[in-house]
Amino acid sequence: MGQKINPYGLRLGITTDHVSHWYSDSTRPGQRYADYVSEDIKIRSYLTKTLDRAGIARIEIERTRDRIRVDIYTARPGIVIGRRGAEADRYRLELEKITSKQVQLNILEVKNPETTARLVAQGIAEQLAARVAFRRAMRKGLQSATSAGVRGIRIRLAGRLGGAEISRSEFYIEGQVPLQTLRASIDYGFYEARTPYGHIGVKVWIYKKPSVRGRTEGGG
């Protein structure tokens, strides 16, 4: 099972935290659980499409009664903030239009993009779109992650690799990636490369350390 599903599915509350922090049992329109889920999807969709080149690692959403806090973790905060914060203000106003609520936007820098699965996947996808050989792009992703000190990394590509007539998948693995060990802190990322031959899916699993709620294996 651990090999087939999204690794976050079984690890929420163990090594992985939720990316949406709110609760609703209201029956009032606009405050129902389904309304909040729909709003979250719209917020994430808008930001990921608009900030495609900003290296977005993850987006966290927290709600109060009449306010939404959105934390954007990015490898390129300058693109999101803009000159004197002009771009950040524009995104915040657009989110307020989408949600009809007051929005607090926080931009946080990702210190180690080489060890963040989604950013590694995006880097490989950008190389594929620039017509770099897929095996070379995969090896570069492996080398940058292992040199940054991760315990293991697995990269899987699927699609018309190298412009082949028939689509196929190929993966490389370096070190340990124990997907069935729930105490293993596994970071997972997915990105699609848009190539002249069609889309190629890029999946990355990064094994950082074994832990349970902040306690490392063998530690006190």
Curated annotation (Swiss-Prot):
Example of a GO cellular component annotation carried by this entry: cytosolic small ribosomal subunit
GO terms under biological process: translation
Entry keyword set: Ribonucleoprotein, Ribosomal protein, RNA-binding, rRNA-binding
Keyword field contains rRNA-binding: yes
Residue intervals of the KH type-2 domain: 43-111
An example Gene Ontology molecular-function term: rRNA binding
Superkingdom of origin organism: Bacteria
The keyword rRNA-binding is annotated on this UniProt entry: yes
Assembly with partners or alone: Part of the 30S ribosomal subunit. Forms a tight complex with proteins S10 and S14.
NCBIfam families registered for this protein in UniProt: rpsC_bact (TIGR01009)
HAMAP family for this protein: Ribosomal_uS3_B
Biological function: Binds the lower part of the 30S subunit head. Binds mRNA in the 70S ribosome, positioning it for translation.
Family: Belongs to the universal ribosomal protein uS3 family.
Protein name in UniProt: Small ribosomal subunit protein uS3
Native source species: Tropheryma whipplei (strain Twist)
Source lineage: Bacteria, Bacillati, Actinomycetota, Actinomycetes, Micrococcales
Gene: rpsC
